[in-house]
From Swiss-Prot:
The gene is MYG1. It comes from Homo sapiens (Human). The lineage of its organism: Eukaryota, Metazoa, Chordata, Craniata, Vertebrata. This is MYG1 exonuclease. The modification Phosphoserine is found at residue 120. 3'-5' RNA exonuclease which cleaves in situ on specific transcripts in both nucleus and mitochondrion. Involved in regulating spatially segregated organellar RNA processing, acts as a coordinator of nucleo-mitochondrial crosstalk. In nucleolus, processes pre-ribosomal RNA involved in ribosome assembly and alters cytoplasmic translation. In mitochondrial matrix, processes 3'-termini of the mito-ribosomal and messenger RNAs and controls translation of mitochondrial proteins. The modification N6-acetyllysine is found at residues 267, 273. GO terms for cellular component: cytoplasm; mitochondrial matrix; mitochondrion; nucleolus; nucleoplasm; nucleus.
Length: 376
């Protein structure tokens, strides 16, 4: 009885264990999150951001945080009131301070010039971070490991962390900070369907000011979260596995053609360009790949020119100008290769009914390279 009495007394006197454990922040430095009072432990965490017109960066920052288990049920507090912001567990895109130790992630203050490169030495990206980039920098590895069902030490997490920043988050950082894609000159056409543009259109219009901004912000978070998860799924299940196919194609390139400048992909629909550029630099002997051949969904063969850069529309060596825009028999006659299907008007891709025919188109182009007008 005495022991039971003492255990009961200790249970009453000692504080209860916390209802949940907050994670340690990831990024350039690991710091403990601010401690919450016992009363706050009973309530969901609070994510603070500014009210009024919203933008893609804070919508993405809040959405990424809510994908983490510890913030899944977090309340979004949209305000500029310093007292209300002070009561929040984490604040993004407002408040005028960047202090990871206190979980304050604003980028608008004059003193803020941080980039992924400056905060994570070794990373190449030098675009000024927005609140989206800051949250991704500090929580991204943990988030991806959680979503991918693996550990942060898994090399896949590091690969996809870089891929998602370069091809998703950095764009949001740049747009929010007003950084143009072009160093000089005017763009030839408008980009109006970007993620940032679609988020902006969820704000109330000038002639309907009574629209619910809070509902619009929730739709914005849902939009950016869905796109983030879709992109991650594509990179995990399509882009990353394609690397092995490109590696195999490069290893077999001399069996395809003695020049080593033509590769054949086992599955043509795979995303090969970035992998080829990365792997090509390590080839021995060094060689530039000019053409990729593969079968399409109809079982016919395609010959695709390797672009000068992964996202470029300009080819290293386009198909001959006299072939461009022609089809079928007209193309057969001009090329001297029976069985042709088409050559695109820009010369970046063509089709043939057989593998040997596609190879003949590539070899004929290589043979004429010194006489071809190349796109500069």
């Amino acid at each position: 009885m005495g022991h039971r009495f003492l255990r009961g007394l200790l249970t009453l006197l000692l504080p209860p264990p916390p209802l949940y454990t907050r994670h340690r922040m990831l990024g350039p430095e690991s710091v403990p999150p601010p401690k919450r009072s016992r009363s706050k432990l009973m309530a969901p965490p609070r994510i603070g951001t500014h009210n009024g017109t919203f933008h893609c960066d804070e919508a993405l920052a809040c959405a990424l945080l809510r994908l983490l288990p510890e913030y899944r049920d977090a309340e979004i507090v949209r305000t500029r009131d310093p007292e209300k912001l002070a009561s929040c567990d984490i604040v993004v895109d407002v408040g005028g301070e960047y202090d990871p130790r206190r979980h304050r992630y604003d980028h608008h203050q004059r003193s803020f010039t941080e980039t992924m490169s400056s905060l994570s030495p070794g990373k190449p990206w030098q675009t000024k971070l927005s609140s989206a980039g800051l949250i991704y920098l500090h929580f991204g590895h943990k988030l991806l490991a959680q979503l991918l069902g693996t550990s942060e030490e898994d090399s896949m997490v590091g690969t996809l962390y870089d891929k998602m920043y370069e091809n998703f988050v950095e764009e949001v950082d740049a747009v929010d900070n007003g950084i143009s894609q072009w160093a000089e000159g005017e763009p030839r056409y408008a980009l109006t369907t970007t993620l940032s543009a679609r988020v902006a259109r969820l704000n109330p219009t000038w002639n309907h000011p009574d629209q619910d901004t809070e509902a619009g912000f929730k739709r914005a978070m849902d939009l950016v979260q869905e796109e983030f998860l879709q992109r991650l799924d594509f990179y995990q299940h399509s882009w990353l596995p394609a690397r092995a196919l490109v590696e195999e194609a490069l290893a077999q390139r001399f069996q395809v053609d003695p020049s080593g400048e033509i590769v054949e992909l086992a599955k043509g629909a795979c995303p090969w360009k970035e992998h080829l550029y990365h792997l090509e630099s390590g080839l021995s002997p060094p060689v530039a790949i000019f053409f990729v051949i593969y079968t399409d969904q109809a079982g016919q063969w395609r010959i695709q020119c390797v672009p000068k850069e992964p996202h470029s529309f300009q080819s290293r060596l386009p198909l001959p100008e006299p072939w461009r825009g022609l089809r079928d028999e007209a193309l057969d006659q001009v090329s001297g290769i029976p069985g042709c299907i088409f050559v695109h008007a820009s010369g970046f891709i063509g089709g043939h009914r057989t593998r040997e025919g596609a190879l003949s188109m590539a070899r004929a182009t290589l043979a004429q390279r010194s006489y071809l007008p190349q796109i500069s």
